[in-house]
Curated annotation (Swiss-Prot):
Protein name per UniProt: RNA polymerase II degradation factor 1
Protein's cellular compartments: Cytoplasm; Nucleus; Chromosome, Telomere
GO BP, one annotated term: DNA repair
Ranges annotated as biased composition (Pro residues): 277-286
Ranges annotated as biased composition (Basic residues): 1-12
A GO CC term attached to the entry: cytoplasm
Gly residues bias (residue ranges): 641-654
Amino acid sequence: MSTFRKSYKNQSKRFNNSHSNSSSTSVELTNLVEMFPDWEADELQGLLSENDNSLEIVIDLIVNNKVSKWEPIKKEKHKKKEKETEDHNSSTNGSTNSASTSSTAPSSDRKPYNKSKPQSSSTRPPKKQHANANYKKGGEKSAEKPKPTSTTSSTTTTPVQKETTPATNSWAAALSNDKPKKSVATTEESEPVEHAEEDGAKAQQEEQETVAELDNTTTTNGEQQEQQPEEETTQESQAPVEQAKPVLKEAAIPEPKQGSWASAITPKTVKPKAKPAPKPVSQPQPPKEEEEKEEKEPVVEEQVSEPVESIAEETVAEVSQSIPSEEPIESPVATATTTTAATTTEPSIVEQPQQQQQPQVVLPTSQQQVNSVGISFGSLSIQEESKDAEVPREEVIAEQTSQPEQTQQQQQQPIQDQQRYGLYNQQQTQQRYQQQQQSAYQQQPQQQQQQNQYSKQQQQQQQAPIQQQTAQQQYDYYNQFQQQYPQQTAQPGAQFGGYPGFDYSGYNQQAFAAASPAANHIATLGGSAGVGGGYGQYAQQAGSTDSSHSPITNQSTLQQQQAAAAALNAQQQQQQMPTPFGYPAYYNYYYNNPYFNAGGLGSTGFGAPQQGNQQGQQPTSSQGASQQGQAQPQVPSAGSQQGGASMGSNGFGGQQQYYNPNQFNNRYPGYSYPPQQQQQQQQPVQQNAGQSQQGSSQSASNSEGASDGQQSSSQGQQGQQGQGPQGVQQGQGQQPPVPQQHMMPQYGGYQQYPQYGYQDSNQYRGGWY
């Protein structure tokens, strides 16, 4: 996207020169305007601003008719045209549009368009400008760049016909306006109605095909692909004419198209339409013009075939000459017109199916593709278009095949972008979901293997750049949040950097794994327990083979949690819950219960004489802390060692440790940290304020490692006597803030303090949930 947007911004600037409307358009707005030509740029801008500039949300809203265009007085002119257009486009915008275009619709309809459009010729083209704010890049800009040849209003030549094309209110109409601009008089005059009718028939056939495609392919995609072909055909055909003019205009016109979201999707189809253009290119510019006119005219003729009748026969020879090339073009144009008409009504619908084959409606990717492809534009893209023009639908179907081309085009784009944007580019959309789920569980080798089946890119992304996976699976929030965890599982706290007080690994224990899915927020940490349902798996995945890790990684979270709970029930009994579910046992802290550490809290935690405890503990606790810190939460031995030392002093054994966590961690705000062993926290910032000597040793073991623990023990010993606020002061005042931060990694500390043997999940549930 970024690459595309950059170039596209430049393009938009370039094209905005002609139209003030698009001058301020964002990339999203530009894309929307191209995709929904019948929408006013300002309306689309409003939608974007209301939806955080989320292109996808706005497209979804529009395509699913969740929002409707305002029809203010300001648009009455527009309304007239639209009404007429809608009359023609009423059924699908595409089918009736092509029908009317193909002269199926009575010429009277077309004529009224011509009539009304001459009236609103100035209005309609501007509307196109608005509706096509981005089409300005494509259709309008092509029109304006053609302006040198014919004014955008094309009033110079035949505003009526030009307007007639807009009457479709479709992207094709916009293009046809452009086409008539250059060849309006000549083309409309030159092309006989017969040719228009042929075009109409082709258009109808293609339209039907297009309709099928629309059914099969998202309207938007089809619209963009087909419309852009027309656009490019028109613009490119104009471009050949313009080739005499600066090439930039050619490039500019196609460029916005390809630069445009639609063009990105359309590039292959666009190539087909450009096909006649190359002939004009090879031919003298006049033939180019003729063909352009012809190309334009097929669209115009479809819409204005009868008006053309009186005028057109003169050019019949010319047209007939170019018709062989044009017919494929015209059919694409007709298709584009019908598709455009249809897509105007249901632009996204067409796009999606095609995009499935092609990139999913991921605009960025297709745009990128287009950028790669379309920036050259002019003859190059025209040739390609000529290739595709012959088989526009096949390519739509074959767009997977054409995707290689797009891929080549996109080669400029990082493959990662493609992957990011959607895994969309691949038919892998389904896979994408699987991948997301799997990627959520990716790290399980089984799924990785399965994914290997998917795409190398996906595998690479999943395994190697988890971040990329996050990007790819942009909305797989679990992946984003949890993929980081495997590294962090060692540091239960670090995973949730924000919650110093909680040892989430305890949650992973899933004392209440089945209790509620919510409980598994922590399970997501995939703490040491290795459970946590799908989430724990991220961290643990290869590590544990819980039922939660069953090969069916895509189990619902509940299933996983339940399975994990079952597994955990055994584990939990075996393992002490290092802490009640990852939250410190506040009960113990709040109440001096010797069982729960009354020694720790009452005696040490709050002004209770901790000195003996701390002194006794600290040496060992520093050692134990070092062990624990390194060993990490699950090492009961370290905790027990500390506990042993503490026990001697406290008489409560590990309970000091137990209370320490709260103290050193300040697990509960404001608690132990000030009085507790902040003395140890004197240790430096490393120790949490609440750590207290024991806590500090533990926290040190957690955050700082043994060295901190040792320091904390020595400082804690010193500060023991200075316990309480003095300890805090001695703790260097850093202690309260820093310790919390450092303690955060120490969540494991709870596990480190297995001595809290009381950690029966039942104790905690009442208060907690």
